[in-house]
Curated annotation (Swiss-Prot):
Oligomer and partners: Acetyl-CoA carboxylase is a heterohexamer composed of biotin carboxyl carrier protein (AccB), biotin carboxylase (AccC) and two subunits each of ACCase subunit alpha (AccA) and ACCase subunit beta (AccD).
Gene designation per UniProt: accD
Enzyme class: transferase
GO terms for cellular component: acetate CoA-transferase complex
Subcellular compartments: Cytoplasm
Function: Component of the acetyl coenzyme A carboxylase (ACC) complex. Biotin carboxylase (BC) catalyzes the carboxylation of biotin on its carrier protein (BCCP) and then the CO(2) group is transferred by the transcarboxylase to acetyl-CoA to form malonyl-CoA.
Descriptive protein name: Acetyl-coenzyme A carboxylase carboxyl transferase subunit beta
Cofactor section: Zn(2+)
Cofactor note: Binds 1 zinc ion per subunit.
Signal sequence, start to end: none
Length: 306
């Protein structure tokens, strides 16, 4: 028995440990929809869209702006703004501590990034929510960064695009966060008065005070495939109305069928299609889009588990 342990079992365990340690962390990713094991470099080439089932995975705000805007000429707006715990709010944890943890986790100061730049050579300003930062919740800094982006559009006579991904208003800022709904809506009214386009792109998920304000105020409202969009969550609605909701309720396809949004665009098509749309809205020549050359990647065998 002892010889079997020494000769067979222990070497087997050691080989298993070596195999596990030889796989770099983050090299493989499991699709949350079809559970396919995907090679991270290959997934980056598809803009974090599963090549097996077309599931659009959540991506960070900075990554989203980097793949949407042209490489040259980007400038971040409102980067100097930092959140302040004016109310000294505390639930199960101090708001100040929640901010510190979110900043450490994401590397961002708050849940919205705004940048000026170009889209296919056309001047634009774009904002994107960082859902990993406290659920992309909207507080004072999110509202102010959004307003600064809109003011940039007003000053430079350029269109604005916003990628929404949020659970709603930030409860730790109470009325201050609710005020951002009116603040962002007011500046969008100014854009409309000046005839400057605002395109809202709804990504997974968009809920609460963000869906009840800026996210649904676009001149054109676009959504990514199968994004969850609503005000209250489906479970809350079912408990309130005491009825089973339809299949796919609050998915972008359901909203498109019922006239709540204008179109659904896959992530890889956002640059050319929004570029063409904005050029028409601004009465500019149709921009030329050159699709990037995607070089083939040698995908190693996937591990049994990740």
């Amino acid at each position: 028995m002892s010889n079997w342990l020494v000769d067979k079992l222990i070497p087997s365990i050691m080989r298993s440990e070596v195999k596990k340690s030889s796989v770099p962390e983050g090299l493989w990713h499991k699709c949350p929809s079809c559970e396919a094991v995907l090679y991270r470099p290959e997934l980056e080439k598809t803009l974090d869209v599963c090549p097996k089932c077309n599931h659009h995975m959540r991506i960070g705000a900075r990554a989203r702006l980097n793949i949407f805007l042209d490489v040259e000429g980007r400038e971040e707006l409102g980067a100097d703004l930092e959140p302040v715990d004016r109310l000294k709010f505390r639930d199960g944890k101090k708001y100040k501590d929640r901010l510190t943890a979110a900043q450490k986790q994401t590397g961002e100061m708050d849940a919205l990034i705004s940048m000026s730049g170009t889209l296919l050579g056309m001047p634009v300003v774009a904002s994107a929510f960082e859902f990993s930062f406290m659920g992309g919740s909207m507080g004072a800094i999110v509202g102010e960064r959004f307003v600064r982006a809109a003011n940039y559009a007003l000053e430079n006579r350029c269109p604005m695009i916003c990628f929404a991904a949020s659970g709603g208003a930030r409860m730790q800022e109470a009325l201050i966060s609710l005020m951002q709904m009116a603040k962002t809506s007011a500046v969008l009214a100014r854009l409309r008065e000046e005839g400057l386009p605002f395109i809202s792109v709804l990504t997974d998920p968009v809920y609460g005070g963000v869906s009840a304000s800026l996210a649904m105020l676009g001149d054109v409202i676009v959504a990514e495939p199968k994004a969850l969009i609503g005000f209250a969550g489906p479970r809350v609605i079912e408990q309130t109305v005491r009825e089973k909701l339809p299949e796919g309720f609050q998915r972008s396809e359901f909203l498109l069928d019922h006239g709540a949004i204008d179109m659904i665009i896959s992530r890889s098509e956002l640059r050319p299609r929004l570029g063409n749309l904005l050029a028409q809205m601004m009465n500019l020549p149709t921009p030329r889009f050159v699709a990037p050359v995607i070089e083939p990647i040698v995908v190693p065998p996937a591990p049994a588990t990740i």
